[in-house]
Amino acid sequence: IPERQKELLYAIASAGKAEKIMSAGFIRKYSLVSSSAVQAAARKLMELDLLTEEDNIYFIPDILFRMYLQRLKNTNIIFIPS
Protein backbone atom coordinates (compact mmCIF):
# COMPACT_ATOMS: atom_id res chain seq x y z
CA ILE A 1 0.00 0.00 0.00
CA PRO A 2 1.45 3.40 -0.93
CA GLU A 3 2.50 5.75 1.88
CA ARG A 4 -0.36 8.25 1.36
CA GLN A 5 -2.92 5.45 1.69
CA LYS A 6 -1.22 4.15 4.85
CA GLU A 7 -1.26 7.62 6.38
CA LEU A 8 -4.98 7.94 5.71
CA LEU A 9 -5.68 4.48 7.13
CA TYR A 10 -3.76 5.35 10.30
CA ALA A 11 -5.65 8.63 10.64
CA ILE A 12 -9.07 7.02 10.22
CA ALA A 13 -8.13 4.12 12.50
CA SER A 14 -7.06 6.64 15.16
CA ALA A 15 -10.33 8.52 14.82
CA GLY A 16 -12.44 5.34 14.76
CA LYS A 17 -14.98 7.00 12.50
CA ALA A 18 -14.01 10.13 10.63
CA GLU A 19 -16.05 12.94 9.12
CA LYS A 20 -14.81 15.61 6.74
CA ILE A 21 -11.57 13.78 5.96
CA MET A 22 -10.74 16.33 3.26
CA SER A 23 -11.11 19.32 5.59
CA ALA A 24 -8.13 21.43 6.59
CA GLY A 25 -8.70 20.50 10.25
CA PHE A 26 -8.56 16.75 9.66
CA ILE A 27 -5.56 17.07 7.34
CA ARG A 28 -3.69 19.23 9.87
CA LYS A 29 -4.62 17.05 12.87
CA TYR A 30 -3.23 13.91 11.25
CA SER A 31 -0.37 15.58 9.32
CA LEU A 32 -1.69 14.53 5.93
CA VAL A 33 -0.42 16.10 2.71
CA SER A 34 -3.41 17.70 0.98
CA SER A 35 -7.12 17.26 0.34
CA SER A 36 -6.44 15.99 -3.18
CA ALA A 37 -4.04 13.35 -1.81
CA VAL A 38 -6.63 12.33 0.79
CA GLN A 39 -9.34 12.14 -1.87
CA ALA A 40 -7.20 9.96 -4.15
CA ALA A 41 -6.14 7.70 -1.27
CA ALA A 42 -9.73 7.33 -0.02
CA ARG A 43 -10.98 6.46 -3.49
CA LYS A 44 -8.35 3.72 -3.91
CA LEU A 45 -8.88 2.34 -0.39
CA MET A 46 -12.62 2.11 -1.03
CA GLU A 47 -11.94 0.26 -4.29
CA LEU A 48 -9.86 -2.21 -2.26
CA ASP A 49 -12.64 -2.48 0.39
CA LEU A 50 -10.24 -1.30 3.09
CA LEU A 51 -12.31 1.82 3.73
CA THR A 52 -16.07 2.38 3.80
CA GLU A 53 -18.07 5.59 3.59
CA GLU A 54 -21.67 5.88 4.79
CA ASP A 55 -23.46 9.21 5.20
CA ASN A 56 -20.15 11.10 4.83
CA ILE A 57 -18.58 9.10 7.68
CA TYR A 58 -15.48 7.09 6.83
CA PHE A 59 -14.40 4.00 8.73
CA ILE A 60 -12.40 0.80 8.38
CA PRO A 61 -15.00 -1.98 8.17
CA ASP A 62 -12.71 -4.79 9.33
CA ILE A 63 -12.48 -4.36 13.10
CA LEU A 64 -9.39 -6.56 13.45
CA PHE A 65 -7.57 -4.60 10.76
CA ARG A 66 -8.61 -1.34 12.46
CA MET A 67 -7.31 -2.60 15.82
CA TYR A 68 -4.07 -3.72 14.18
CA LEU A 69 -3.57 -0.27 12.65
CA GLN A 70 -4.32 1.46 15.95
CA ARG A 71 -1.80 -0.69 17.78
CA LEU A 72 0.79 -0.37 15.03
CA LYS A 73 0.50 3.42 15.01
CA ASN A 74 0.49 3.82 18.78
CA THR A 75 3.38 1.48 19.60
CA ASN A 76 5.70 2.18 16.65
CA ILE A 77 6.25 -1.55 16.19
CA ILE A 78 7.09 -2.59 12.66
CA PHE A 79 5.56 -5.99 11.97
CA ILE A 80 6.36 -6.07 8.27
CA PRO A 81 9.40 -4.10 7.09
CA SER A 82 8.87 -1.84 4.10
Regions found by a protein language model. Give the residues of each.
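Short amphipathic alpha-helical interaction segments
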Residues: Y30-E47
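A short, conserved structural fragment
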Residues: M46-N56
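Accessory beta->alpha helical hairpin/"wing" motif in late/C-terminal subdomains of nucleic-acid enzymes
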Residues: D55-M67
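Winged-helix-like regulatory helical subdomains adjacent to P-loop NTPase cores
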Residues: I1-S35
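Short, amphipathic alpha-helical interaction segments positioned at domain boundaries
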Residues: L64-S82
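Small/polar glycine-rich anion-binding or flexible loop at a beta-alpha turn
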Residues: F26-K29, K44, Y58-I60
